[in-house]
Swiss-Prot record:
One of its GO terms (cellular component) is cytoplasm. GO terms for molecular function: ATP binding; UDP-N-acetylmuramate-L-alanine ligase activity. Its EC number is 6.3.2.8. Belongs to the MurCDEF family. Gene3D superfamilies: Mur ligase, C-terminal domain (3.90.190.20), Mur-like, catalytic domain (3.40.1190.10), NAD(P)-binding Rossmann-like Domain (3.40.50.720). Pathway: Cell wall biogenesis; peptidoglycan biosynthesis. One of its GO terms (biological process) is cell division. ATP binds at G108, A109, H110, G111, K112, T113, S114. It is an enzyme of class 6 (ligase). Cell wall formation. Keywords: ATP-binding, Cell cycle, Cell division, Cell shape, Cell wall biogenesis/degradation, Cytoplasm, Ligase, Nucleotide-binding, Peptidoglycan synthesis. It catalyses: UDP-N-acetyl-alpha-D-muramate + L-alanine + ATP = UDP-N-acetyl-alpha-D-muramoyl-L-alanine + ADP + phosphate + H(+). This is UDP-N-acetylmuramate--L-alanine ligase.
Length: 437
């Protein structure tokens, strides 16, 4: 048994990885800021100790896992080096873990967390699968055959991994604080493709993914019969979305997903492709798909009277459009009200017009002040620049949250990657519900 200390344990990936090592029988603790972060709930439920940052946390015989947000000058990292302990970055450590399994990386600008959550749930319907999801959820199952994990492209972190398979959901320009342009993003994915050992499953309608070159087969999925695996006869029902799946032009089977929206069918196709390639039992896969309950902060719903309140991590224009589409398809007779908190000044500046276009698909839009990050907490841009581009949009905060009560037959979408949940909870408090998210 090894004693691990995680520097930045409340980070979504770090939290997941700490849980995995705990489940596998190791002694685990970590440190982070004292502010509440939703990822700490799962850590505390497993009895994993969370400490405030302090050099004295670091003891002899520990292995220290260094979170990506923390430099080598951090007091705990400095102490670890003074004690001559092994200090391993999150990416390198995860790369070592996955080599023990048949591994499936899920990467892409959008849809990583939802697809990884679905993949881990569905594969566990037939084979033991350990998993690491970007919503702070992780589980290490002893004697697992497979390992499903989220692989982030930011700062090219995913180049630390050499997975057996990679699901590539899409390539899009994001993280403008690091990537120069879409070509820079493509180059990162192209390099990652050469790390894959068995096969790549990629969305067929993505023009950039169609240009990817690899040393292994690339299987494209989508809605066209020119794709290697595709869905047809899609029907929206009160139980979710039903569809037929074809592989290489031949009917494979009929599936039902409890979710709504084209993007959820695409996620399911990617997962079904992995199951098909690994020859998993299709009956078990179908049953598992029908019971998928979603992942944290991805269209999580609470219903109060005729109002449906949704918590969603959407923080990029394409993700906002997908979330609004899901609301329209699932609740076609309700208004859609978007409450959005932009995340980072650089992203808001880079996609200002795209944010305005995607948010305008809602019936009414409310915007919060821009949420900064550890690396970037100021900027010349203000939220008024975005408000001015959306007809009827207005600023909202905890003092004005009552305005949402007038939409008594609506889906209210709280979207963002910052602390938008504070606003949600303030609204739920006013409605007499606490701690829903």
């Amino acid at each position: 048994m090894t004693h691990y200390h995680f520097v930045g344990i409340k980070g979504s990936g770090m939290s997941s990885l700490a849980q995995i090592m705990h489940d596998l029988g190791h002694e685990v603790q970590g440190s982070d800021i004292e502010n509440y972060v939703f990822t700490e709930v799962a850590l505390r439920n497993k009895g994993i100790k969370i400490l405030p940052f302090d050099a004295n946390n670091i003891k002899e015989d520990m292995v220290v896992i260094q979170g990506n947000a923390f430099a080598s000058s951090h007091e705990e990292i400095v102490r670890a080096h003074q004690l001559k302990l092994d200090v391993v970055s999150y990416n390198d450590f995860l790369g070592q873990i996955i080599d023990q399994y048949t591994s499936v990386a899920v990467t892409g600008a959008h849809g990583k967390t939802s697809t990884t959550g679905l993949l881990s749930h569905v594969m566990n319907g037939d084979k033991k699968t350990s998993f690491l999801i970007g919503d702070g959820t992780g589980m290490g199952l002893p004697e697992s055959d497979y390992f499903a994990f989220e692989a982030c492209e930011y700062r090219r972190h995913f180049l630390s991994y050499k997975p057996d398979y990679a699901i590539m959901t899409n390539i899009d320009f994001d993280h403008p604080d690091y990537f120069k342009d879409i070509n820079d993003v493509f180059d990162a994915f192209q390099e990652m493709a050469h790390n894959v050992k068995k096969g790549i499953i990629a969305w067929g309608d993505d023009e950039h993914l169609r240009k990817i070159e690899a040393d292994v087969p690339i299987y494209y999925y989508g809605f066209k019969d020119s794709d290697d695996i595709y869905a047809q006869n899609i029907q929206i029902t009160d139980k979710g979305t039903a569809f037929d799946v074809y592989v290489d032009g031949e009917f494979y089977d009929h599936f039902l997903s409890p979710q709504y929206g084209d993007h959820t069918v695409l996620n399911a196709l990617a997962v079904i492709a992995i199951s098909y390639l690994e020859k998993l039992d299709v009956t078990n896969i179908k049953e598992a798909l029908e019971t998928f309950g979603g992942v944290k902060r991805r269209f999580n719903e609470t219903t109060i009277a005729n109002q449906v309140i949704v918590d969603d991590y959407a923080h990029h224009p394409r993700e906002i459009s997908a979330t609004i589409e899901t609301a329209r398809k699932k609740y076609p007779h309700k208004e859609v009200v978007a409450v959005f908190q932009p995340h980072t000044f650089s992203r808001t500046q880079a996609f200002l017009n795209e944010f305005a276009e995607s948010l305008s698909k809602a019936d009414r839009v409310f915007l919060c002040e821009i949420f900064g990050s550890i690396r970037e907490n100021t900027g010349a841009l203000t939220i008024q620049d975005l408000i001015d581009k959306i007809e009827g949009a207005s600023l909202i905060n905890e003092d004005s949250i009552n305005v949402l009560e007038q939409f008594d037959n609506a889906v209210v979408l709280f979207m963002g990657a910052g602390d938008i949940q504070k606003l949600q909870n303030a609204y739920l408090d006013k409605l007499g519900m606490k701690n829903a998210f």
